[in-house]
């Protein structure tokens, strides 16, 4: 359990202030061995599905690997766990607590009226908009913040800045970049107007002032 708590702190808890954790963290954290849950099949039989890393149930966060298996977790495993945990924390639990006032400059870059019509689809990336067709400007702003947060915490800077158009098979990176939804988004070939990089810098600064270093989370366990 000691080793398990150590990696939970390193990949998750240590990246948030005590105030944020006290305010938004689940009421109970359980360090378990193997977390599984069951669901009924069409035949009414019970099927068991293993949750490899963690589960959030009834305001309780339950972690697996409370035994010797924690020693077998690879960097790839830890990178995946890290992404899932921080996406849950930063794009679900903390949404209502985002530092909105500090994000005004970030939100001023994009003309959100263009996110409401597919007629502007070809302009979206130039506007710094990474989402899909929005229902309203307010909804677009909320989605925009969450999308940038997800991009930064799940994608190392090296992958964000890579020129995906210059990589082809059999370059080993050809397969690596396929694991990253946001690969190349900060490269000029995709960020043609520089607005994605501009918004990247603004949201990183706003969240850092808030006490969360998004790029540090993005680099964690990246090889």
PLM segments and residue spans:
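Extracytoplasmic/secreted proteins, especially bacterial periplasmic and envelope-associated proteins
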Residues: 3, 7, 24, 80, ...
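Short glycine-rich, low-complexity/disordered patches
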Residues: 14-31, 99-104, 214-222
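Active-site recognition of the HExxH zinc-binding catalytic motif
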Residues: 58-112
């Amino acid at each position: 359990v000691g080793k398990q708590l150590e990696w939970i702190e390193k990949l998750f808890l240590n990246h948030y202030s005590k105030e944020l954790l006290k305010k938004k963290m689940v009421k109970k954290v359980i360090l378990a061995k193997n977390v599984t849950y069951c669901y009924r099949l069409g035949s009414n039989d019970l099927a068991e599905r293993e949750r490899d890393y963690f589960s959030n149930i009834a305001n309780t966060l339950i972690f697996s690997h409370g035994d010797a298996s924690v020693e077998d977790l690879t960097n790839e495993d830890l990178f995946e766990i890290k992404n899932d945990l921080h996406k849950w924390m930063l794009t679900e639990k903390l949404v209502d607590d985002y530092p909105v006032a500090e994000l005004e400059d970030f939100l001023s870059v994009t003309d959100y009226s263009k996110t409401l019509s597919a007629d502007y689809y070809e302009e979206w990336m130039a506007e710094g908009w990474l989402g899909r067709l929005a229902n309203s400007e307010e909804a677009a702003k909320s989605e925009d913040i969450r999308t940038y947060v997800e991009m930064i915490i799940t994608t190392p800077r090296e992958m964000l800045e890579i020129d995906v158009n210059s990589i082809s098979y059999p370059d080993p990176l050809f397969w690596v970049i396929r694991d990253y939804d946001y690969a190349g988004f900060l490269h000029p070939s995709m960020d043609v107007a520089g607005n994605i990089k501009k918004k990247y810098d603004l949201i990183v600064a706003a969240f850092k002032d808030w006490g969360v270093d998004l790029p540090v989370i993005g680099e964690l366990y990246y090889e």
